[in-house]
Amino acid sequence: MNFYSINLVKAHLINYPCPLNINFLWNYGFLLGIIFFIQIITGVFLASRYTPDVSYAYYSIQHILRELWSGWCFRYMHATGASLVFLLTYLHILRGLNYSYMYLPLSWISGLILFMIFIVTAFVGYVLPWGQMSYWGATVITNLLSSIPVAVIWICGGYTVSDPTIKRFFVLHFILPFIGLCIVFIHIFFLHLHGSTNPLGYDTALKIPFYPNLLSLDVKGFNNVIILFLIQSLFGIIPLSHPDNAIVVNTYVTPSQIVPEWYFLPFYAMLKTVPSKPAGLVIVLLSLQLLFLLAEQRSLTTIIQFKMIFGARDYSVPIIWFMCAFYALLWIGCQLPQDIFILYGRLFIVLFFCSGLFVLVHYRRTHYDYSSQANI
């Protein structure tokens, strides 16, 4: 068993063959794994002092911040790590879109399942501080499920967000990261099963071992990210949390503007700009399903240079519009629900789906095998 474990580590962490021309865009997976591990460690320490009760949840957070030794550090590292996880996840997905990573369907789908686990974990975790924004944000999101029979009662443990809700959310927030950790190993298994991609997209026998060549590149990226992570955690350069969430819950007073965390803003913009609650929920689910459908494409060649020569515009232009629509929805999500922003939000929702569907529908023409024309 010991020899098997040693050989497994050597095969996947030391001698794993990687393309020679991998650049810094391939660091996001390694960085995500490190930050996700930090999230689990800090979360376990915070959970040991947290009280999942509506009468004590807010005050247990204040106890961690004000009375425990370095409790404030663990709390802000955990909050900053959540933002960093989603930032790296979005960059990882966009890199996959740009370099046609969806042509490895097992790796792509397992990564998207992990992304869904991140979304659910972050949402239930946002409710746990039991501040004004946490309570009213959970109320708004759970009310979207009111069109589904008994869904709100099953999730919240009642007709509204209350004490059973925070207990259930705490259990989910504690368990889901460990489920996500299992999905991480599955994702790595499928990645190593097919082999890593590279910026040019061609399969070559010229490969180098992961250690020490590419590990040094990952460590260099980790040094840059950990500096930003510590600066944000210790000094709070960018205000990531809403001030209303530092106020204890008052069920009779609604905040002037209910805004989720920044990484939920694109989905919140879809919910806010659509007048019908069921329709908004369906659009959010379809936006996630669109990413899964991209794995149904089959490319005869993924060589980026040949695509750029013979047919890249049909692929790169809708991908660029897809990214622009996502960033525009992120900005619209934090704006007031005025008519102009609602109009822009609907336009960018249409652009988001049209650009994604264009890639799906035209993949046969866009990714025609031009290898014979390139004499390879």
Swiss-Prot record:
Binding site for a ubiquinone: 192
Transmembrane segments: 28-48, 72-94, 107-127, 169-189, 214-234, 274-294, 317-337, 340-360
Residues the record lists as binding heme b b566: 92, 187
UniProt entry keywords in alphabetical sequence: Electron transport, Heme, Iron, Membrane, Metal-binding, Mitochondrion, Mitochondrion inner membrane, Respiratory chain, Transmembrane, Transmembrane helix, Transport, Ubiquinone
One GO cellular component term noted in the UniProt record for this chain: mitochondrial inner membrane
Record organism: Plasmodium falciparum
Predominant subcellular localization, coarse grouping: mitochondrion
GO MF, any single term: metal ion binding
Family: Belongs to the cytochrome b family.
InterPro entries referenced in this protein's UniProt entry, alphabetically: Cyt_b/b6_C, Cyt_b/b6_C_sf, Cyt_b/b6_N, Cytb/b6-like_sf, Cytochrome_b_N_euk/bac, Di-haem_cyt_TM
Cofactor(s) essential for the protein: heme b
Gene3D superfamilies assigned to the protein according to its UniProt record, in alphabetical order: Cytochrome Bc1 Complex, Chain C
Free-text function comment from the UniProt entry: Component of the ubiquinol-cytochrome c reductase complex (complex III or cytochrome b-c1 complex) that is part of the mitochondrial respiratory chain. The b-c1 complex mediates electron transfer from ubiquinol to cytochrome c. Contributes to the generation of a proton gradient across the mitochondrial membrane that is then used for ATP synthesis.
Name of this chain's protein: Cytochrome b
Additional information: Heme 1 (or BL or b562) is low-potential and absorbs at about 562 nm, and heme 2 (or BH or b566) is high-potential and absorbs at about 566 nm.
Cross-referenced CDD domains: Cytochrome_b_N
Topology in membrane: Multi-pass membrane protein
Gene: MT-CYB
